[in-house]
Structure formats: structure tokens, C-alpha cells
């Protein structure tokens, strides 16, 4: 399983960090977890186009986690090279209605010309997707928010939080995972509801006992040295601070 950070940033535009997005490649399939702005271009840097994506998982529907879906769908209609492979979009309950409203807002300009879109709503539980299974659990951000754990046929696992505060659901998803990708939105002194700070990241990762931890979703007040020092004082596993296009192999 190959995992690439497409965007390690936030809702605040940055020259250095795209908004949230992760690419998971397994057995010649390409799955996205979130699709924030800038991530579509990051895919092109990897040689991956709108033809290649098989499935998109959304942790929730805030713009910094999904707005590159619009140019993706619009580009896939390009008449000289239209997408032909069906696309599955996976998200929490209520996403189907949200997606219909999004499509309506753009009239017919996002409607596929030569492929079908299937919306799969999953609440909490496990679903088999062939080359991997996905466990979904509620996390603490907004009502639709879900965290995911991907497990391939070799037993390798990656857990992803999207946006979340400290919660049991994310601890369970990250339990002894080979890799856990957690948001670390703000420094401790700037804590806001629905987001993690370094001390809580360290506590969550320690309780989950994940093997490797990658932090992402850094708002401008974040100081990387302080984040690393604070988290490392609590969590003793391997720690990475995400950069766009950082890759992991499991």
C-alpha cells in the first residue's frame, strides 16, 4: 500500500501547502481521501489524471476537504478525452443530498458524459472494497464527519482522521495501525473546538499505540519544532510532520 500526502494545509491558502488530501494506491487502484484545493494539481505531479481515480472518500464536506471535486468533474467531461471509468464516492450519511445540491448548483456542467457516479453512504462499520476493507467511525468535528481505517489483504493498515477533536472513535481507528494520519490544526494555546492540538495528538496516538504517526492540516500559527517536541514527549513511536507529496509505503 502506497500513501501520498497531496495536501497538508488548511482552509487558509498557502504557497507551500495544498488543502487536505491523501492518495492511497493498492493493487493498481487509486483512491483519494479528501480532495481539497490544490490536490488535483498534486495528482498531476504524480502522473495521475481524472481518468485514473477509482474512488473518493470524504471525511466531511467542508470546502478545504473537497472543493477540487468540482474541477475534477468538470475536466472529466472534456470532449476530446472524456473520462469513461465509473466513479464511486464514499462519505457519511447525508452526503448524497449534499452532492445533489452541488451538482444542481452547476446545472449540467458537472454531470458525467460517458461514465456513472455512485454515491455510497457509510455510517459506522466495515465495508469491503476488494483489495482493501475500510472501517468507518464517527469523529468529533461536524455531524457528517467520519474517520477511516484502510486495511489491505496483507494486513497493513492506515488510519486517517480528517478533521477531529480528541475522541474514542479515532483511538479505535488508529489502534496499532501501521500508519495514522492525524490533523494537528493549532498550537495548544490556540485550541478550538473540533480540532486537535499537539498535546492531544500525543495523547491520542499514545493510547492508540499506532506504529507510525504523520501529522497534517497545520494552520499558520503552528510551529513545527514545538509540535514535534510536544508530541514526542508523549508519543514514542515514529513521528512525521507532513509535507505535500510526502510518501509512505506499507
Feature names for model-found ranges:
Residues 38-90:
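Active-site metal-binding motif and surrounding structural segment of the metallo-beta-lactamase
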Residues 86-88, 92-145:
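Metallo-beta-lactamase
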Residues 72-88, 140-146, 151-152, 193-214, ...:
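P-loop/Walker A phosphate-binding loop and immediately adjacent motor/lid segment at beta-alpha junctions
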Residues 43, 69-72, 99-102, 170, ...:
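Hydrophobic packing residues within well-ordered alpha-helices of enzyme cores
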Residues 32-36, 54-60, 92, 158-162, ...:
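Active-site neighborhood of phospho(di)ester-bond hydrolases with catalytic His/Asp-centered motifs
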Residues 166-248:
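Cap/insert and terminal regions of metallo-dependent hydrolase folds
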Residues 1-46, 146-162, 179:
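Conserved beta-strand hairpin/beta-sheet module of binuclear metal-dependent hydrolase folds
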Residues 48-51, 85, 113-115, 130-132, ...:
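Structured loop/turn residues at beta-strand edges in well-structured enzyme cores
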Amino acid at each position: 500500500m502506497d500513501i501520498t500526502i497531496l495536501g497538508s494545509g488548511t482552509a487558509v491558502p498557502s504557497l507551500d501547502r495544498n488543502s487536505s488530501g491523501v492518495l492511497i494506491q493498492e493493487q493498481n487502484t487509486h483512491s483519494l481521501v479528501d480532495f481539497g484545493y490544490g490536490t488535483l494539481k498534486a495528482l498531476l505531479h504524480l502522473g495521475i489524471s481524472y481518468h485514473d481515480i477509482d474512488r473518493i472518500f470524504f471525511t466531511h464536506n467542508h470546502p478545504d476537504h473537497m472543493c477540487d471535486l468540482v474541477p475534477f468533474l468538470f475536466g472529466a467531461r472534456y470532449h476530446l478525452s472524456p473520462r469513461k471509468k465509473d466513479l464511486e464516492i464514499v462519505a457519511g450519511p447525508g452526503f448524497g443530498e449534499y452532492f445533489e445540491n452541488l451538482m444542481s448548483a452547476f446545472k449540467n456542467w458537472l454531470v458525467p458524459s460517458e461514465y456513472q457516479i455512485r454515491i455510497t453512504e457509510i455510517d459506522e462499520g466495515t465495508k469491503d472494497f476488494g483489495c482493501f476493507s475500510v472501517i468507518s467511525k464517527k469523529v468529533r468535528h461536524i455531524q457528517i464527519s467520519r474517520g477511516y481505517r484502510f486495511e489491505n489483504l496483507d494486513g497493513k493498515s492506515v488510519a486517517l482522521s480528517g478533521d477531529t477533536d480528541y475522541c474514542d472513535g479515532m483511538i479505535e481507528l488508529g489502534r496499532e495501525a501501521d500508519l495514522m494520519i492525524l490533523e494537528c490544526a493549532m498550537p495548544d494555546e490556540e485550541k478550538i473546538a473540533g480540532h486537535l492540538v499537539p498535546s492531544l495528538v500525543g495523547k491520542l496516538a499514545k493510547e492508540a499505540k499506532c506504529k507510525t504517526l504523520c501529522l497534517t492540516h497545520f494552520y499558520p500559527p503552528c510551529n513545527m519544532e514545538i509540535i514535534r517536541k510536544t508530541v514526542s514527549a508523549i508519543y514514542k513511536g515514529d513521528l512525521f510532520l507532513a509535507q505535500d507529496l510526502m510518501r509512505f509505503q506499507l
